[in-house]
Amino acid sequence: MENIQLKKQIKSMDKVLFIVRGLPGSGKSTLAKSLGSVHFEADMYFMEGNEYKFDITKIKKSHEWCQNQVEISMKNGNIGDSRIAVSNTFTQEWEMKPYVDLAEKYGYTVFTIIVENRHGGVNVHNVPEETLNAMLNRFETKLI
């Protein structure tokens, strides 16, 4: 019953930003696509047609691109539906700050969602196990 009430409350909100966090393969992208009318993630920067071409030297640029896309969407009022979802690993709190700042600037309510891999999701980007473990070890949660 509480989930239904929360859904109704969120749907009635004018401007919402969903920040979807989790390790690679957890299902962030799938969830984010279902939440917002617009969805962004840094991985989109590496898409060439239908092919994903990751380049570690461009990681900073990919995150700048993602933040810029979110801001453009917020500025434009997201053309009729102001629900935006951004999904990245966001393993540390400071990585979300630029998005929280944008939300404050443009009057968006922020919901942060942590996606766990309880469904046995596959790591589609072939991130090595040791990298996943390092990401898990630095994953920060700040509960009030």
Protein language model regions, located:
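Pre-Walker A adenine-sensing motif
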Residues: 2-12
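Walker A (P-loop) ATP-phosphate-binding motif of ABC ATPase nucleotide-binding domains
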Residues: 17
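Hydrophobic anchor at the beta1->P-loop junction of P-loop NTPases
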Residues: 20
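The conserved Walker
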Residues: 24
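Conserved glycine(s) of the Walker
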Residues: 27
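Hydrophobic positions on the alpha1 helix immediately C-terminal to the Walker A/P-loop
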Residues: 31
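Short beta-strand-centered segment that lines the nucleotide-binding/catalytic pocket of NTP-utilizing
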Residues: 38-51
